[in-house]
Amino acid sequence: MNQRLPFALAALGILVLAGCGDPPREAEHRDSDTGRWYGVEQVMLGGPVFATHCAACHGARAEGAEEWFRRLPDGRWPPPPLNGTAHAWHHPLWQLRQQIREGSDPEHGNMPGFAAVLSDAEIDAVIAWFQSFWLDEIYAAWLVYDANFPDPSSHQKGLE
């Protein structure tokens, strides 16, 4: 059996799922230059912001802490890679924004919140910058994930 068959089937499944569901959301709006939700300008802004506020923990190229997958002695998790090699793509856009604004749950990690430091535009630029490292296959899988996990607060706004 061809070793690539499971990957090909998974990719096909992702593409099929991408075609299902609700109308396009924010992350699905495509920039003509990047083909992604963000533009080149955001990536260019995000690099220096990431270098200033994030690289000390997540690495200069968003590679994360060495052995990011092993708990620290205090039971918390080290900073994970954000470059598409770990689980960042398992978080929808609203959750990535929230994590940067509010920081991690103190029981799980040491990440501080940046709501008082970074504007919403800078937060989006940081996300654009690290997502620019993601392979197209990872980005496509993330789009499906993002579409299937809408921001719960957006549902509340419609009920008010």
PLM regions: where:
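Solvent-exposed, polar/charged alpha-helical surfaces in well-ordered, non-transmembrane soluble domains
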Residues: M44-P48, T52, P80, W94, ...
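Bacterial N-terminal signal peptides that target proteins for export
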Residues: M1-L9
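Short microdomains enriched in Cys/His and/or Lys/Arg
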Residues: G75-A88
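Periplasmic/extracellular electron-transfer cofactor-ligation site
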Residues: P24-E26, V40-E41, G47-W77, E102-N110, ...
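Flexible coil segments in periplasmic/lumen-exposed cytochrome c-class electron-transfer proteins
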Residues: E26-D33, A51, H90, G109-E160
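C-terminal motif of bacterial Sec signal peptides marking the signal peptidase cleavage site
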Residues: V16-G19
